[in-house]
């Protein structure tokens, strides 16, 4: 068997020979961030109090600082709607919440990501341990984590693998979701110097670099050679 630790609960499966996964996505993002700063990029973490304009140039204000830009990109994932609402653009962005648990020290029970399609969850060996993920709910940004969904993940994992202890940590992630399952990539309909890149659902990490390249080309008035109309915010006008 490819995965000898799995219980014999299945009749068969599908293997994706060329599928890949990252055992620690955060490490990759840190390396990308380091490269960004080495090339002159600057990072500031601030609470944004206001977004307005000075002769069509976007202006961001915190409690103590004011920044004016030639062009501004809103790429805040599920939190992007807080800014698009301020720009009077009615974008139906929803928060699709997915749940995760870790079993630290049990990552060697499987050698690759495994999805149990009938139960709607999956398991992945990570540096932090065996990660079990699944379930989807439209729960907004403020509602608390659902303990029943965590319990279901743990029970489902134990249906597949023997000897799992109590899990070490649990959390949920926010996926920015739009009704047509396409992201928004392109300029604001109301303000020509504001651009959007959000709404990538479950594929933000996968498509982030591609979207960044597209937005960079648009801001620089370069030809992308792509039909971006399906990704325009105008589709929700």
Language model features: what each stretch is:
Residues 38-42, 89, 161-166, 223-225:
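Surface-exposed helix-capping loop/turn segments at secondary-structure junctions
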Residues 44, 73, 195-197:
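Hydrophobic/aromatic beta-strand patches that form the interior of the parallel beta-sheet core
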Residues 1:
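Dinucleotide-binding Rossmann-like beta1-alpha1 core, especially the glycine-rich loop
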Residues 184, 189-237:
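C-terminal lid/capping helical subdomain adjacent to the catalytic/cofactor pocket in oxidative enzymes
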Residues 31, 38, 82, 156, ...:
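Alpha-helical scaffold segments in soluble metabolic enzymes
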Residues 53, 57, 66-193:
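Active-site substrate-recognition segment that forms the wall
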Residues 9-71:
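Helical element adjacent to the flavin cofactor pocket in flavoenzyme catalytic cores
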